Amino acid sequence: MAAPSRTTLMPPPFRLQLRLLILPILLLLRHDAVHAEPYSGGFGSSAVSSGGLGSVGIHIPGGGVGVITEARCPRVCSCTGLNVDCSHRGLTSVPRKISADVERLELQGNNLTVIYETDFQRLTKLRMLQLTDNQIHTIERNSFQDLVSLERLRLNNNRLKAIPENFVTSSASLLRLDISNNVITTVGRRVFKGAQSLRSLQLDNNQITCLDEHAFKGLVELEILTLNNNNLTSLPHNIFGGLGRLRALRLSDNPFACDCHLSWLSRFLRSATRLAPYTRCQSPSQLKGQNVADLHDQEFKCSGLTEHAPMECGAENSCPHPCRCADGIVDCREKSLTSVPVTLPDDTTELRLEQNFITELPPKSFSSFRRLRRIDLSNNNISRIAHDALSGLKQLTTLVLYGNKIKDLPSGVFKGLGSLQLLLLNANEISCIRKDAFRDLHSLSLLSLYDNNIQSLANGTFDAMKSIKTVHLAKNPFICDCNLRWLADYLHKNPIETSGARCESPKRMHRRRIESLREEKFKCSWDELRMKLSGECRMDSDCPAMCHCEGTTVDCTGRGLKEIPRDIPLHTTELLLNDNELGRISSDGLFGRLPHLVKLELKRNQLTGIEPNAFEGASHIQELQLGENKIKEISNKMFLGLHQLKTLNLYDNQISCVMPGSFEHLNSLTSLNLASNPFNCNCHLAWFAEWLRKKSLNGGAARCGAPSKVRDVQIKDLPHSEFKCSSENSEGCLGDGYCPPSCTCTGTVVRCSRNQLKEIPRGIPAETSELYLESNEIEQIHYERIRHLRSLTRLDLSNNQITILSNYTFANLTKLSTLIISYNKLQCLQRHALSGLNNLRVLSLHGNRISMLPEGSFEDLKSLTHIALGSNPLYCDCGLKWFSDWIKLDYVEPGIARCAEPEQMKDKLILSTPSSSFVCRGRVRNDILAKCNACFEQPCQNQAQCVALPQREYQCLCQPGYHGKHCEFMIDACYGNPCRNNATCTVLEEGRFSCQCAPGYTGARCETNIDDCLGEIKCQNNATCIDGVESYKCECQPGFSGEFCDTKIQFCSPEFNPCANGAKCMDHFTHYSCDCQAGFHGTNCTDNIDDCQNHMCQNGGTCVDGINDYQCRCPDDYTGKYCEGHNMISMMYPQTSPCQNHECKHGVCFQPNAQGSDYLCRCHPGYTGKWCEYLTSISFVHNNSFVELEPLRTRPEANVTIVFSSAEQNGILMYDGQDAHLAVELFNGRIRVSYDVGNHPVSTMYSFEMVADGKYHAVELLAIKKNFTLRVDRGLARSIINEGSNDYLKLTTPMFLGGLPVDPAQQAYKNWQIRNLTSFKGCMKEVWINHKLVDFGNAQRQQKITPGCALLEGEQQEEEDDEQDFMDETPHIKEEPVDPCLENKCRRGSRCVPNSNARDGYQCKCKHGQRGRYCDQGEGSTEPPTVTAASTCRKEQVREYYTENDCRSRQPLKYAKCVGGCGNQCCAAKIVRRRKVRMVCSNNRKYIKNLDIVRKCGCTKKCY
């Protein structure tokens, strides 16, 4: 007997138990899913197929479980297993470097706007993609092509306007697709192609008006389809015919027109009673509200007018918008198309696309339209044709491509076009024709290559064209060398060239007709052999005209070029294009055709942008210089192809934003200079800070230009939390092809109508020709939003809230022909508001509030034919007489405009009323005058003067003693509100005040907050309670977080990583530590190690700290890394000069008389005195700068005068004291004085004058006992009295100028003696204390001050005269005694020796055997007689930039060089003048250089 089976003795296997347990649950879930699916939301509610348990979607893993490690998880996301959750993170772009193993990706609840082609590359295992609740309006082609495993895709609750064709073609496994709650209007026939497994498709809550009849073709597995709440009026016949498994269909809430075209739907719904309930008619009126399924066929009627009309989305509707289709011809001429249409009627045989803006023919552009016989693409902007763009067109007979920008014909582009008879390629930029280009064109009879850049043609190019009858080759720069000999022979035998093709070069052949030349004329010299490979498009070019070529370097610097030359030699390694007028780098493949190019310089041009893929193929470029241009943004396709780029310089452009991924592919980049760019540090730039920290590149640092809170802060140092977007600062990079939100862009027409816009959108495309902004809420026309629209011809701003047209608002819109501003609140038209509109033909200002028109307002409107001014309350006095005369000249006003005032002119037509009736009989009312000038409303108070400003703004110029927008406040002790915490300040008497505290505060200044930690608190885990304003917060112990410190912190996670400057965070469970990079230290590696503590700078050089390094900033005349280079005086003067042992302390020795023994000292900035021994003027440039002096003597009086200059609103000028004190500071641009001799309360006063304007001001301070007097710029003196028992201010502490040390500053601030802790920033030119000029060199202590005001004065000079190169000049005469041997006559190699007793002042020392006065006689020398050459030493004027290290002068300098010869002596400067030159460095540092300018040259023996 067999042993019993092991399975009969054991309980059922676990897998079987599990199935028995969950089977009832699954059946229940299936029942619920079937009924709830169309309206369910999340991935968890997908339909369960009828294929049984195997398709339920529950997976019990039986092997290893994949996990995405932390290193492969995007920093802003969280990863669990193979799931990546990036939801609700405020993202503006899809995170980079998502693991290729991810199966579920959640991106819902972010701020994504565009899905780019590269966003989901390599994610071949992705099964679920969640993109709901974003702002997505565009999906690029092929964005989902790598998602071959995708099962569920949610795109609902976005702003999609259209769905790309074939966008899920690669996703054959897709089960569920949700695109509901968007703004989609049409669904084309190829949208869902390839999604044969799709079971659930949700398209509800869109704006769909058109469904292609084949839209759902092939979706044989579809079970659920929702189309409810759209704008469908009809449906193509039998559109649901192939959906045999459909079990849920929603069509409700659509405005169906129940005519004869919809009768099929009624029959369909009656046969499938469970589908599409509540589908009702909207029209005609007798059927409105009726259920479609309840109607009989005879009730669906069509009127005679519509019986034969095509259905709204019928088969005929495949005609592409906005083209016209008839009889097999698709006419798309002049429709502003930018690409070839993707849909055409099936019977199309002729396609007309001329005069559009098409730029390329992509692969297989016409492969679906095999019936095409004629294609016209003339007069477009086509520069690129894919090699298979014309594949499949076997019936094509005519191809017209003239008037484009084609530069290259790819190999095989005409392959298979055996029926082609006419090929027009004239008026392009074709430079070469491959030998096999026309190989398949056996039927071609006419070929035009007229007007291109072809230099040669390879033998055999025309061999395959057996039917050719006419060829046009003229207007090409043919090089008639031996390589073109065959063409002359060919044209002799086949006289088919009828355009008169001629030679361009060589010179002997210039302008000679090719067909008339004999074969022996076609010769090749060595350099002309470069055309030998023309048939392979590998010929090389000569050096471009206007450029200089040396070796492999092509230098086109400073040639005034407006575009890059096309004939750059192929062997070029360095291309220099600096200092030209290039405006934009085109994506025309130029750099990709230079295989050896390593260095490209484009500095100091007018570049505003670089087209995407402009550098594609330029894989060997290592250095790219783009500094000092006008580039405004960096796109993510700008530098594609630069795989070996190491150095990228974008210094001094106008870059405000960088698109994510812009530098991602620059793997070799080591140096990136982004200094001097106005980066907008909002939420769109947060990724860039992280990228910069990670890369640690060399070069100028990128700094924020906005918002003001973070201005000048290095981007990489800014924490992620500081990158914020607000309503005023939310704009990111717009990029090419951008269309503003709430607008639709079709070609060059932009429509932004009826969108409740408050202002004109930013980023309107520059090529816009028509702009519609009507029916919004725009109140003001921002000039900067429209000034770039130079192609605009029509602008509609009607039905808005505009109140004023300011001067020169439309000055740049020179092509504008129609301007509509009707039905606004326009009350003021300024004199030059319409200046520049020379081509304006129609102007509508109808329905506004205009009363007056300035004379000459319409003088630029030379082309005007119609003006509408009706329904305006025009005031018809003598001020409008000019308008009456003007409209009667050409009758451009149709007789609608009427007068509203004055009474005698009321309701009279301006056109028909005689001009003599327009007279002035009294003063115009203020309410009318105030429409353009708000000052007539008298807004200013206290006798202030009102000054009118643009946009009907105004400014009140206050009388002394008042301030505020309307001068409504007095300048008294309460100026600037000295009370804290929103307390109310009340003046007690002159100079004294009291504070009434808000609830929760106490103290003299309401500075003390009531301690809320004394009551019951909820802080946990030994947290410390921190008092707030009627609240408290818990300060947690290390390792805890949360409002009440009840959460354990996960150290070193993306949410908590305080380590800065590239430091590595290490988690120790209870705490963390940071492993700092070199050059940093501190708990979070935030402190830069001061490398200047042990610096080696010599000769007074200033140490400048860096990152793990320092630099020495040398004084004048010293050079070297450590300023170790010697002073130049010893070389500038002979050893006998008095300057050799001068006594100048802080200056340069100067001899006014070269022959004398006296000298003067020219002092360095800030120093005075005979020997420059006194430091009397200093600059303060740091927040903690100050000077410490001895205590101020106050008996019998204290008198302090400070001459200073500052552009900062706040800063400490002087301070001395403790409780009793004298404090003087800048506060809100005025001088604030706090004076207390010990009599409480303190006395305070403010200057009436504003002094923070960058100009020099003198403030005089006089303290006599209790009295204190202030006078500014010798104006009116004002006084206060600190009344009380004490008479004198007793001071024993040091006096500080320009700032305070930390401890005294905190104490003074705490005691309300000063209003801010900021040091003075500016220059103190002179300081007098008790009638003595202060020598700061004797100060007890100095901290971070700079001698003199040179920097400030340099900036002032720059503002006053930007064109002036030099700041001053000082004659310098080099001491050079006359050399008697300078023009000696010694011969035959003899030596000249000075001798004062000789007749000529010198003596000739002859060689052996020579004699004579000049050694010109005798024997003994085998040397031939020599003659001293006449001196050719001369001064040569030049004008160029002066450069030094990485710096240069601001302007080209006019100076001279000594050139020529002096025999055996040197040609050098005899007289020089020293001038100060402003220098600017690449890192934005500025300084002043003392430069010796040559004034006279001569010969000298001293060659140095």
From Swiss-Prot:
Boundaries of every LRRNT domain copy: 64-100, 310-346, 534-570, 730-766
Q: What happens when the gene is disrupted?
A: Flies lacking sli exhibit disruption of the developing midline cells and the commissural axon pathways.
GO MF, any single term: Roundabout binding
Kindly list every residue the record annotates as glycosylated.
111, 231, 381, 459, 807, 812, 982, 1022, 1084, 1183, 1199, 1267, 1316
Q: Which domain of life is it from?
A: Eukaryota
An annotated GO cellular component: cell surface
Which residues form each disulfide bond in the chain? 543-549, 547-556, 657-733, 681-704, 683-725, 935-946, 940-956, 958-967, 974-985, 979-995, 997-1006, 1013-1025, 1019-1034, 1036-1045, 1052-1065, 1059-1074, 1076-1085, 1092-1103, 1097-1112, 1114-1123, 1139-1149, 1144-1161, 1163-1172, 1323-1349, 1381-1392, 1386-1404, 1406-1415, 1433-1467, 1447-1481, 1458-1497, 1462-1499
Give the UniProt record's GO annotations in the biological process aspect: axon guidance; axon midline choice point recognition; dendrite morphogenesis; digestive tract mesoderm development; embryonic heart tube development; epithelial cell migration, open tracheal system; glial cell migration; gonad development
Q: Which residues form the Laminin G-like domain?
A: 1176-1349
Q: For the LRRCT domain, which residue ranges apply?
A: 254-304, 476-526, 677-727, 872-922
Which residue numbers delimit the CTCK domain? 1433-1504
Signal peptide limits: 1-36
Assembly information from the UniProt record: Interacts with robo.
Instruction: Describe the task this protein carries out.
Output: A short-range repellent, controlling axon crossing of the midline and a long-range chemorepellent, controlling mesoderm migration and patterning away from the midline. May interact with extracellular matrix molecules. Repulsive ligand for the guidance receptor roundabout (robo) and prevents inappropriate midline crossing by Robo-expressing axons.
The name this protein goes by in its record:
Protein slit
